[in-house]
Amino acid sequence: MRNPLHKALWSACLCALGVSLVLLANFTHVQVGEITSTILGIIGMTLATIFLFTFFWALLSAIGYARLMSGNGVIARWHVTAGDWDRFRTFDEIRASEHLWLRNDVRIRKLTPPQGVDVIVGRASIIVDGSYHSISDRASGGRQMNWLNPPVDLECIEFPKSYPRSKGGSVELTLRVPVPASARAEGVRVFEHYRAEDKN
């Protein structure tokens, strides 16, 4: 998630709008009519319910993001140059086309930042190019964390991810992170940390 604090604020505003519509429908149902007040109430309840959950999710992400950025609970961090990130982005598109669950959970921007990309890995979360992700809720069901060795260029760590669907089932994705040669020791440290967790 990019800009989690910004999304939390927007979600709070939309949730408040939903509550306001419900109150408006309740207090003006005589003046505006039953049909209009019912429509306002339904819209308001929908907004309030959806964005209340979105607010808490974004707020927790914002707190986690701030902690990692301050260095709290960081296991490793490394920098990916713009050239390396371009190579990774090309490979990521190829890898994601192999299977639906290999699509990257990180939404890679179309334009590579000229300064490159920072990766910060914590005990339960990761920041990739400013995008915050939890990795404490990795997918189960046979899929395991993976290290992609050469000839893959760059080497990558893959974390399986699973998001529940509202209608049942789940959406399976993969959080794929490049590990440049200069940061291989840091990448190995992260891989071993989470592999040990998976065994427990």
Predicted regions and their residues:
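Cytosolic juxtamembrane helix at the C-terminal end of the final transmembrane segment
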Residues: 58-72, 130-140, 187-194
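Phosphoinositide-binding peripheral membrane targeting modules
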Residues: 103-155
